Amino acid sequence: MELGALLDHLVGKALATMLGGIPIVKPSPTELIPQQPDCVEVGTCRVIGGVRPQNFDVVYRPDGVRFAFDSKTLNDCKSVQKNYQNMINDLGTEATTVHTRFPYALVAFLVAVPHPCLSSPQKEALTGTLERLSSRASPLNSNHKAEAISLVVWDPESGEVDRDWPENTSCLRIERFSQQIQTAYLARYKGLPPHA
């Protein structure tokens, strides 16, 4: 299984558990509503937002988009150097696309970069920019921000996550990702159907 697909599966499973053990289904890439009334969709899922149609990897949309997730993997040094700024632009556009039409929706991103491909000053620049794009606290805040972003720096030899970067105080730490999503989701949707 490719890294991005593995991350999507894990996020979808955690989201379905958080929502009370609802089913996980594979979406139809052309359908604008889910195949079941209350499910988490994992796979290419089309969302029609305020800027353009956008594909996401994990979506929960019982009554419109409530949660949209996209994983971004830059798998080699050439790709990181060449594409990381474009990826940052994509994140802002994807968040804007969802939040313009669904301001209460949660948008989350997980960015995975191999450790050997992330060096100074690019490492600090990428981290700082992702921190600024993260932590959208209210539906009234900037549409271009995501409610949660995680930066995962990993060792391609061992498969282990770098425990030293991002720094321990960063909102981008993978250990904080699920809690940020749960906190934001409960603040916006607690007590509302379909899982009241």
Predicted features by range, described:
Residues 119-196:
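Non-catalytic C-terminal interaction segments of nucleic acid-processing enzymes
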Residues 29-38, 113-118, 156-158:
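Short, internal active-site loops enriched in acidic
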Residues 51-69:
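Active-site beta-strand-loop-beta-strand hairpin of nuclease catalytic cores
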Residues 39-54:
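N-terminal low-complexity, intrinsically disordered segments
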Residues 1-43:
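Acidic-basic catalytic patches of nuclease active cores, encompassing PD-(D/E)XK
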Residues 73-123:
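Catalytic cores of nucleic-acid endonucleases
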Residues 16, 99-100, 141:
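N-terminal cationic-hydrophobic initiation segments that often serve targeting/anchoring roles
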Residues 68, 108-111, 151:
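Structural beta-sheet core signal
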